[in-house]
């Protein structure tokens, strides 16, 4: 649990320098994992509006809502396979604990001047993206 707490705290620490709590919703991926739950709790305590994605929507939605999250979405909503370099902006920022295509989709859907931190690879160590989100949205990406 110590490693999960440290990883979550480090991701949030880097994140809050770039994303103000009034900028909009923050997505936390892998919502029922240890790092994601701790990051979610920290963000909520700091006053951020948090949306969590999970593959365990039916089993864990109430638990996550009881933590104080704004919404819980299915992980398929952050798993785009369209090949488009940019998608409709949804998030002020993202704390990604999954990696893979979830990370690529999170980058595509982050708002202008948003930030994405990543600290996990349960969804895979490789991801495909383009430079467009970084150039056109002035996106900040942190590992």
Predicted regions and their residues:
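Glycine-rich phosphate-binding loop and adjacent beta-alpha segment
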Residues: 101-143
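Local beta-strand N-terminus motif with an aromatic residue
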Residues: 69, 90-92, 134
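Short amphipathic alpha-helix with an adjacent loop that forms part of the alpha/beta core around
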Residues: 78-90
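Short, acidic/turn-prone active-site loops that include or flank metal/cofactor-
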Residues: 55-57, 76-81, 120-124
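Short acidic active-site motifs
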Residues: 59-60, 81-83, 101-105
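Short, well-ordered coil/turn residues at beta-beta hairpins
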Residues: 75, 96-97
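N-terminal Rossmann-like NAD(P) cofactor-binding module of classical short-chain dehydrogenase/reductase
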Residues: 92-95, 117
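Mid-domain Rossmann-like dinucleotide-binding core that forms the NAD(H)/NADP(H) cofactor-binding site
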Residues: 2-76
């Amino acid at each position: 649990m110590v490693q999960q707490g440290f990883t979550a705290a480090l991701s949030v620490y880097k994140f809050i320098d770039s994303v103000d709590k009034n900028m909009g919703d923050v997505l936390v991926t892998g919502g029922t994992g240890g790092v994601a739950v701790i990051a979610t709790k920290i963000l909520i305590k700091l006053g951020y509006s948090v949306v969590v994605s999970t593959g365990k929507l039916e089993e864990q939605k109430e638990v996550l809502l009881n933590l104080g999250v704004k919404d819980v979405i299915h992980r398929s909503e952050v798993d785009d396979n369209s090949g488009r370099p940019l998608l409709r902006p949804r998030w002020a920022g993202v704390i990604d604990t999954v990696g893979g295509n979830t990370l690529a989709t999170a980058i595509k859907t982050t708002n202008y001047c948003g930030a994405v931190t990543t600290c996990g690879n349960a969804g895979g160590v490789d991801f495909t993206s383009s430079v467009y989100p970084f150039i056109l949205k002035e996106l900040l990406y942190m590992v």
